[in-house]
């Protein structure tokens, strides 16, 4: 009898999930909550829900930060040390007491990336003043006093994924905020590593001219679907769960050959599971959807010909608002310079065969309650399978998936 192959443990190797926003700060009465008392415990916290107006193209993008302490004491701050050359030593992780978070004797030994960095003030010489904090609580308190509505800023942070009522949600957690430089244009960019399988490329949405791309995002959970992922406390932090998240890839309908090659090169997976890191943009509520000349109805084109509108005026009048939609649009694969000092080469961050399909079929993904015996739950949507195998469709777009 053949020995059952062990599953490969999921891990975040060469994994990135970060964002950058450049635009105007939108500060309202509800942006900050200061020294709020939790209803469930003795926890005191500060919370920031900040919108950044990244312009008509991207809209107002939300990001957040929250942190606090226990009234009864015992709050610890996790940090890491420095190496002799001053670089971060991630292998040297430890905690300091809450009351020591401003103690210079401790701060001088802590690695740079343990700090949140804020630079939204200038000195008398017009130089940016950088303030560093160990806790989100102190960051939010400082921003509450100093961040002003309309201030042009650059925000960097990490993407965090969670599950609420069976829906995957994304949070943009702030790491740093600086004044944007004069030459920096609006930006709403993210970089996200994901896992792709043969079902990831779905049937194109021909109204929006996009391919839905479903990737798996790895996030660590202590409990998932009623299952204890710490194995009774033996596994600190829990285990990684592959969360299904839908992205979009825009295509040019006028160049079918280019679209076909682009999908084949980057997204198509023939076997096993591929890991890829993509750069993309957020488009959220308030973004303006720009109309092109080809999109204009004939009656409006006639008004242009008769001189009632210029082409520019007509395009502006026909632009529509994106409403409450929240989109993550994939643009291009990430390129990273790898190798030693004498042999550095650019490398597309795409790794085929990272896992087998079976590696993602984990027992703890199934809800703990007994499933209905009359209904078998598949690891993918039945519609997805039909799309992948539907190669006889008349449309060239449909032939790509």
Regions found by a protein language model. Name each.
Residues 1-401:
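OB-fold and OB-like single-stranded nucleic-acid-recognition modules
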